[in-house]
A protein has these predicted regions:
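A metal-dependent hydrolase signature that marks the N-terminal structural subdomain at the beginning
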Residues: 1-50, 187, 191-197
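Catalytic Zn2+-binding segment of zinc metalloproteases
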Residues: 98-114, 126-133
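Short helix/loop segments within enzyme catalytic domains
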Residues: 12-15, 25-26, 121-158
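Short alpha-helical catalytic segment bearing the HExxH-like zincin motif
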Residues: 89-97, 101
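Short pre-active-site segment immediately N-terminal to the catalytic Zn-binding motif
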Residues: 75-92, 109-114
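Structural recognition of the beta-strand scaffold that forms the well-ordered cores
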Residues: 71-74, 101, 122
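Catalytic zinc-binding patch centered on the HExxH motif and its immediate surroundings
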Residues: 40-72
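Pan-zinc metallopeptidase signature
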Residues: 159-205
C-alpha cells in the first residue's frame, strides 16, 4: 500500500508516478493534484462538499470536483476496495478521477457523460500501463483493473438501458468499463480520446 501512495504523490520525474504520466500528456499545464479524504457520513472539505452538504451523496464514492480542482475520496470506500482486490483497487479509482482532471486541463472532455466516464476508465488503463512499464506494479495487478471496473459498471436494475448516455450520472456498463480500461492499458491515449468522442458512449473498435 505504501508504494501505491508513493505512486499517487511522487513528483514529476519519478518513474511510473501518476504526476510523471500526466506531465508527459499535458506538460507544465499539469500540476500536483490536491486530494481531500473524508469518511462516510461526512462531506468532503472542498467546494463540492460545501455546495451539496449531504453526506449521502458522497458515501462510498470518489470524485473530481471541478469547482476547486480537487480529488475527494471516501477513505471507507477505498478501504473496502483494498480488502476485496488489494491496494491497486483504490489506486485505479484514483487514476479514474485524475483522468477527469487531466481531461479538463487538456480540454478533451467526452461528448456525453457516459463517453467521458469511459474515457476516464481508458486513461486509468494508460496510467496503469505506465506504472507497470516502470516496474511499479505487476502485470497481474494491472490487469485486475479490468475486473474492478467491470464490478463498478452500471447495472442497477436496468438503469443502463433506461437512461441516455447524456444522463448526469451515466457511466459505462460493466463490459464497457472493463473494455475501456483494457484498451487504455494495451493501446495509446488517442484510443481514449476516440472513446470520449462516442455520442452513444459505446466502446467498440
Amino acid at each position: 500500500m505504501q508504494d501505491v501512495e508513493r505512486l499517487i504523490n511522487e513528483p514529476v520525474g519519478c518513474p511510473g508516478a501518476l504526476n510523471t504520466f500526466w506531465h508527459g500528456e499535458l506538460g507544465d499545464a499539469w500540476t500536483a493534484p490536491r486530494f481531500v479524504p473524508y469518511h462516510d457520513g461526512e462531506v468532503p472539505d472542498d467546494a463540492c462538499g460545501r455546495q451539496v452538504n449531504d453526506p449521502r451523496q458522497f458515501a462510498d464514492n470518489a470524485l473530481y470536483c471541478t469547482l476547486d480542482d480537487t480529488v475527494a475520496y471516501s477513505v471507507d470506500f477505498l478501504d473496502e476496495l483494498a480488502q476485496v482486490g488489494g491496494p491497486t483497487y483504490p489506486l485505479f479509482v484514483l487514476m479514474h478521477e485524475l483522468s477527469h482532471r487531466g481531461d479538463r486541463i487538456g480540454g478533451n472532455l467526452g461528448v456525453v457523460t457516459r463517453a467521458e466516464e469511459n474515457q476516464a476508465d481508458c486513461f486509468a488503463g494508460r496510467q496503469a500501463s505506465a506504472a507497470h512499464d516502470a516496474g511499479r506494479i505487476a502485470v497481474r495487478d494491472a490487469l485486475q483493473g479490468a475486473l474492478l471496473f467491470y464490478s463498478l459498471g452500471d447495472t442497477r436494475g436496468g438503469w443502463f438501458a433506461q437512461e441516455p448516455a447524456s444522463a448526469p450520472d451515466a457511466h459505462g456498463s460493466p463490459r464497457q468499463r472493463a473494455q475501456a480500461f483494457a484498451l487504455g492499458y494495451l493501446r495509446d491515449s488517442s484510443t481514449c480520446h476516440t472513446i470520449g468522442r462516442s455520442e452513444t458512449g459505446d466502446v467498440s473498435f
